[in-house]
């Protein structure tokens, strides 16, 4: 039995954009440029919602000068809850996904790094491969969703450097997905 997102009430209405790969003839890719995703959303009235996402460019994260445990970090649109029913344990997911330099952590990752300490409001630093630093304030702690399509430890909003990534569309029940 196929169990990924089996408890998601939106499961039957979520579609990933796939297109011909420019790198490999005859292959499909789920990479969509930021501009193409916006054009699809604006040109097809049947699209209820769009969710763009991509891994971040961070090499590692630090808290108070110490390197944190390895983490999968994803930047995404604020429409996450239109697609996936995440439950917030503490804080505001909306703030994490709409305010620059804010972030949400999974409950498991927060416990791994901070133990039982309430980490809402704490600041962590992202360090990319060039050594450039960017600070994020923790705005939310999310409960894990078993067998979720999305696998991550940290979430943040899409920033100005977003060029593209995976794009999901939410269509209404019964919509012609091939149109």
PLM region descriptions:
Residues 15-18, 51, 166-169:
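Active-site-flanking beta-strand signature of metal-NTP-handling nucleotidyl enzymes
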Residues 19-30, 38, 52-79, 85-102, ...:
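Short acidic/polar micro-motifs at solvent-exposed secondary-structure junctions
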Residues 45-49, 118:
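Glycine-centered tight turns that cap/initiate beta-strands
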Residues 77-90, 101-179:
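Mid-to-C-terminal secondary-structure elements
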Residues 1-18:
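Alpha-helical transmembrane segments
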């Amino acid at each position: 039995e196929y169990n990924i997102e089996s408890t998601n009430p939106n499961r039957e209405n979520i579609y990933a954009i796939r297109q011909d790969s420019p790198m490999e003839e005859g292959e499909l890719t789920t990479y969509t440029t930021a501009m193409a995703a916006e054009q699809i959303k604006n040109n097809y009235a049947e699209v209820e919602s769009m969710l763009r996402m991509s891994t971040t460019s961070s090499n590692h994260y630090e808290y108070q000068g110490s390197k944190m445990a390895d983490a999968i970090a994803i930047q995404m649109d604020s429409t996450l809850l239109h697609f996936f029913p995440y439950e917030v344990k503490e804080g505001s997911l909306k703030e994490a996904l709409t305010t620059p330099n804010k972030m949400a952590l999974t409950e498991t990752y927060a416990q791994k790094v901070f133990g039982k300490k309430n980490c809402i409001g704490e600041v962590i630093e992202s360090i990319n491969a060039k050594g450039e630093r960017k600070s994020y304030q923790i705005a939310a702690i999310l409960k894990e969703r078993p067998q979720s399509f999305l696998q991550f430890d940290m979430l943040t909003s899409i920033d100005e450097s977003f060029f593209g990534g995976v794009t999901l569309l939410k269509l209404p029940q019964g919509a012609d997905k091939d149109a």
